[in-house]
């Protein structure tokens, strides 16, 4: 049995499969995941699991060199925006319009849907390298 880290087998597989510059999107309940995308749906109920906790768990195992968010998060969801800024204080944070974000996210290797129910709680994690 695995001792630590991500116990969800699909997410563990997603992280282990990431190469340099691959993208993994963590999104809220209402996000329109592309029809043919590979994703895991973690939603149990509204808010469970939440956006920030999901990011923190993925970061436990994934090396990230850059993140992309919708600029609208700063105005419409200041609480999560500030948490994202704190979590990624040493990593490039690229802001795009929500429409641009959705276009970029279509290229994500994987999606993780959370139970988050606050506006613009979506992020693209761009995989880095550990050397």
Swiss-Prot record:
GO terms classed as biological process: D-ribose catabolic process
Keyword field contains Cytoplasm: yes
Active site (catalytic residues): 20 (proton donor)
Pathway annotation: Carbohydrate metabolism; D-ribose degradation; D-ribose 5-phosphate from beta-D-ribopyranose: step 1/2
Keyword Cytoplasm belongs to the record: yes
Signal peptide: none
EC class of the enzyme, as a word: isomerase
Pfam family, one: RbsD_FucU
GO terms for MF: D-ribose pyranase activity; intramolecular lyase activity; monosaccharide binding
EC code: 5.4.99.62
Keywords assigned: Carbohydrate metabolism, Cytoplasm, Isomerase
Gene Ontology cellular-component terms listed: cytosol
UniProt: substrate binding residues: 28, 98, 120-122
InterPro entries in alphabetical order: D-ribose_pyranase (IPR023064), RbsD-like_sf (IPR023750), RbsD_FucU (IPR007721)
Principal place of residence: cytoplasm
Annotated localization: Cytoplasm
Annotated disulfide bonds: none
Subunit annotation: Homodecamer.
Function of the protein: Catalyzes the interconversion of beta-pyran and beta-furan forms of D-ribose.
Family named by the database record: Belongs to the RbsD / FucU family. RbsD subfamily.
Protein name: D-ribose pyranase
UniProt organism field: Petrotoga mobilis (strain DSM 10674 / SJ95)
Native organism taxonomy: Bacteria, Thermotogati, Thermotogota, Thermotogae, Petrotogales
